[in-house]
Amino acid sequence: MTAPMILTGSGSAAERDARMAHTAMAFVQLFNGGYHVITKVALNVGVNQLVFCVCRDLLALSILAPLAYFRERKIRTPMNKSLLLSFFFLGLAGVFGNQLLFLIGLTYTNPTYAAAIQPSIPVFTFLLAVMMGTERVNLLRIEGQTKVGGTLVCVMGAVFMVVFRGPALLGDKDADFAMNNEISAKGQPEPTGWLVSGFLDLGFEQWHIGVLCLIGNCMCMATFLAIQAPLLKKYPANLSVAALSYFFGTVLMCTTAFFMVKEPLDWKLTQSEVLAVIYAGVIASALNYGLLTWSNKIIGPALVALYNPLQPAASAFLSRIFLGSPIYLGSVVGGFFIILGLYMVTWASFRERKTAVSGIGIAPHGLKTSEPLIFNGTVNRLGQLFSGLPSSSVKSAD
């Protein structure tokens, strides 16, 4: 009889936390839209991508580490090798790979493209959750079929953005080409330039390379969310999770920059680059990752990832105003399919959550945990009571 008691005792608090998490994630995506535009300005000046990432990460770590140490020193669990390995992979995927691939992709595209492909993150997160066993799909029900169909539609939209750009609907296409060519000659660390040259020799265009890197950026972010959610159950200090992830990511970024950045002048930043680093380090890194980790603990990675579609509108609007970036037909069509697939998955998830919550109210001992990652915090705790049991075999055990 404990399930109803848990719901009654903490339901209002869980709902309040969930509302705050949803609001926080909306602001995170708004801040990300501004980050796309501000970073593009820095790339236009010719900042080295690795130098930018190193400065950003060091600034973010200098904020997150003291906050985590003083605020959570009483709730941190003892460290072990398994936790250290998890934090390393979080830093590798969510900080190192995520940031570097995004900047390379943004260099060869524009903020509109960078934001338009972000809605694929929820689908990649869903696929990883299925492979990890934290998300289950029943293909005999309409919800499961819609999830799979929405996943395929979203992936199709992402692929479409890679293979087709089309005419510029708004803005000057030639100006965009000239801007990308100018950027590619400045601020490129040698191995990155060599890698880009290799793709160009294979017949790829610069925008192909850019979109492929942006897809890799989305896959890294999905991996970060999928790994972080179960880790937060074992290590509930969310600020410390963000700080430790940034520690390993910063170590990887600094090590890479040490070997790849050859020119001492690359470490000298202009005023606009310094402002971009401050925004990236304080807002897009420390604040956003802190809010993201806390929200992931409250509402789970699937719902956290579902807020990424807010980025395209904000980024396209801001980049069109401040940068004059063109909007291409490929980004519009591909973005439409990405968002269509996203909301197919969202609708199916909502239906399953509604059914599961209704089942709790009618027969609490028959609770099914088909989607533990997208319940609210209270339902997540209920799901943990039955961890290790298949959902179909959960019975009353008074």
UniProtKB/Swiss-Prot annotation:
The chain crosses the membrane at residues 27-47, 50-70, 84-104, 113-133, 150-170, 207-227, 241-261, 274-294, 298-318, 321-341. Pfam families: EamA (PF00892). Its main location: membrane. It is a multi-pass membrane protein. One of its GO terms (molecular function) is transmembrane transporter activity. SUPFAM superfamilies: Multidrug resistance efflux transporter EmrE (SSF103481). InterPro entries: EamA_dom, WAT1-related. Residues 32-144, 237-346 form the EamA domain. It comes from the Eukaryota. One of its GO terms (cellular component) is Golgi apparatus. It is found in: Membrane. Keywords: Membrane, Repeat, Transmembrane, Transmembrane helix. PANTHER family: WAT1-RELATED PROTEIN. Belongs to the drug/metabolite transporter (DMT) superfamily. Plant drug/metabolite exporter (P-DME) (TC 2.A.7.4) family. This is WAT1-related protein At4g19185. It comes from Arabidopsis thaliana (Mouse-ear cress). The lineage of its organism: Eukaryota, Viridiplantae, Streptophyta, Embryophyta, Tracheophyta.
